[in-house]
Amino acid sequence: MSSNTDPNGMKVVVGMSGGVDSSVTALLLKQQGFDVTGLFMKNWEDDDDDEYCSTRQDLVDVASVCDVIGIDLEVVNFSAEYKDRVFADFLREYEAGRTPNPDVLCNSEIKFRCFLDHAMALGADRIATGHYAQVREWANDGRSEYQLLKAEDGTKDQSYFLYRLNQAQLAKTLFPLGALYKRDVRRIAAEAGLHVAEKKDSTGICFIGERPFREFLMRYLPMRPGEIRNLDDGRVIGEHQGLMYHTIGQRKGLHIGGIKGRQDGAGEHDAWYVAGKDVKANVLYAVQGHEHPALLKTRLSATDLHWIAGRDPHTHWVYTAKPRYRTPDMPCEIEALVDGGAEIVFAEPQWALTPGQSVVVYESKVCLGGGVIA
């Protein structure tokens, strides 16, 4: 916690989702002496009566937790902002044949922009969320600078999803769970009598929830069947129902098992994987074998760059990067920074680099920022 976060008289608004992480966040801040208010954000309302929508139960859980902790609860609807700033981009990316990560945009545009602005209007000094990450304030050339650091619990670290935050946002943000492990968070919740102590963590994209992804996407984007071709020789080996349903490295759902990858039958029992898309021709390309060269690349181009410190990192400097969440940090160099883009070269081949996903760059535990894989 930064040196300028003396709890005496400081008002903190906590973004609460109904889960154990945000609940313990509010509890810890209250115990530390902050003036805490809980805030529940409703960011999606197209499916209020849908069997997959948990918003109503989540709000009930938040209200119960706030009652136990003894804090006030505010409810705000950001559904219009979410559709305009996050969901519209999500659909555009899928139409363009890419695989977006809406959680990154949701954080920068909704949770740390709309929510932050709303909290400040309520008179807050800081906001807090249940993200597993850390903020560090340090003096750089006589001025304060804020760094985003990985969480102590490496299995739960969420800095990857927060790489688009800026200095102003980090300066107003607290991450009380950054130094804790998940097991400790659940223990704290149980000891405090919070009924969400063992509540299952939410999974999947926030507005899709647990519903089948294809079923959800079909409501907004029309199916457009086309050919599946073998990338190696161009042969038609199947049919897809829409490029948007497939991502690079995908194995399941191609329905082309048993087809020989090569005319000579070599490797005919290897699984097929998505290796590329031709959006204009509506063709999906597949290759046979997990280690096929088309799935292994040492270089990527990134666009829409954002650097947390507000300045470019060094080129030809050894960093690490995550080309997707849940992958280990991989040694890399930023080879060039040109026209708002970057060329990133990894020390070892990376499997299934996916256009639309984020590549996030680190220097040790410090998240420097990143961009979108082109």
From Swiss-Prot:
Marked site (Interaction with tRNA) residue numbers: 131, 357
Subcellular location: Cytoplasm
Segments for region (Interaction with target base in tRNA): 101-103
Keyword annotations of the record: ATP-binding, Cytoplasm, Disulfide bond, Nucleotide-binding, RNA-binding, Transferase, tRNA processing, tRNA-binding
Catalytic activity of the protein: S-sulfanyl-L-cysteinyl-[protein] + uridine(34) in tRNA + AH2 + ATP = 2-thiouridine(34) in tRNA + L-cysteinyl-[protein] + A + AMP + diphosphate + H(+)
CC per GO annotation: cytoplasm
HAMAP family: tRNA_thiouridyl_MnmA
Known function: Catalyzes the 2-thiolation of uridine at the wobble position (U34) of tRNA, leading to the formation of s(2)U34.
Family: Belongs to the MnmA/TRMU family.
PANTHER family on file: MITOCHONDRIAL TRNA-SPECIFIC 2-THIOURIDYLASE 1, TRNA 5-METHYLAMINOMETHYL-2-THIOURIDYLATE -METHYLTRANSFERASE
Name of the protein this chain belongs to: tRNA-specific 2-thiouridylase MnmA
Species annotation: Aromatoleum aromaticum (strain DSM 19018 / LMG 30748 / EbN1)
Gene behind this protein: mnmA
